């Protein structure tokens, strides 16, 4: 590689020869291969500057102009993908490269000009359920909590992070009470780029409902204080619907007792 070639020596006619660099070569080696200037609205410019894969090659000082030109082709696709996560699916991009011989920072500058276009807005949201939660009258409040607490509303801007957060937030509410093994069985963000609209749908599969069973202990872990001490501290309500907060409170009581090194 280049570093090995520069650091090695060759023997010719019994003489030890080392490569000689000019002052210009030394200056070039100390500079980055290129700098990146993203010209876009501030929030978009900051996001692209931080996440563009092109940044990984910036400090390769021996990168040639031809190699950088090839990288710019991939950078265009990467920038469009990143803009899509912010809800901009029809942007206009222009990528330019120019030499910067007078710069002490980089040998070249890559200028990325972005016209993001309209941000996609959420048009509608469909939240469905499958499994026992779907028809169980006693689960009505839980269904309403998931639907009513949904964090993305029609008219809001679509972002991938917001979409992921909304889906996961609904699943957490599903898992906290009665259905700890519930999952997202279907989710779709159907984006109409021309209309700048997103149609969201998600289905939560509750899985079976759980109740607290009799407390069981492992003998080798309860030799000192015994099963009864654990039962009195935990106070788990046998036969009651599973409730994550009740479980966490039991764990906290056991941990705070000082009897055990760890509780999980």
Ranges and model annotations:
Residues 1-50, 56-264:
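Periplasmic polypeptide-binding modules associated with outer-membrane biogenesis and secretion
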């Amino acid at each position: 590689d280049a570093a090995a070639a520069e650091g090695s020596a060759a023997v010719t006619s019994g003489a030890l020869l080392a490569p000689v660099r000019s002052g210009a070569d030394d200056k070039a080696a100390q500079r980055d291969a290129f700098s990146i200037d993203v010209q876009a609205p501030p929030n978009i410019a900051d996001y692209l500057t931080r996440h563009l894969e092109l940044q990984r090659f910036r400090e390769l000082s021996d990168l040639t102009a031809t190699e950088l030109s090839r990288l710019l082709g991939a950078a265009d696709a990467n920038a469009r993908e990143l803009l899509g996560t912010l809800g901009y699916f029809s942007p206009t991009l222009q990528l330019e490269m120019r030499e910067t011989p007078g710069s002490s920072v980089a040998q070249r500058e890559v200028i990325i000009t972005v016209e993001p276009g309209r941000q996609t807005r959420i048009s509608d949201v469909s939240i469905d359920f499958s499994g026992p939660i779907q028809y169980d009258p006693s689960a009505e409040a839980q269904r309403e909590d998931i639907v009513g607490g949904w964090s993305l509303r029609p008219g809001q801007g679509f972002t991938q992070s917001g979409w992921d957060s909304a889906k996961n937030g609904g699943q957490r509410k599903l898992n906290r009470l009665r259905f700890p093994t519930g999952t997202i069985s279907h989710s779709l963000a159907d984006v109409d780029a021309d209309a700048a609209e997103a149609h969201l749908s998600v289905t939560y599969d509750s899985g079976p409902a759980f109740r607290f069973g009799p407390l069981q202990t492992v003998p080798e872990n309860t030799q000192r204080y015994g099963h009864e001490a654990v039962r009195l501290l935990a106070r788990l309500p046998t036969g009651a619907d599973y409730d994550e907060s009740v479980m966490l409170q039991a764990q906290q009581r056991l941990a705070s007792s000082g009897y055990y090194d760890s509780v999980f």
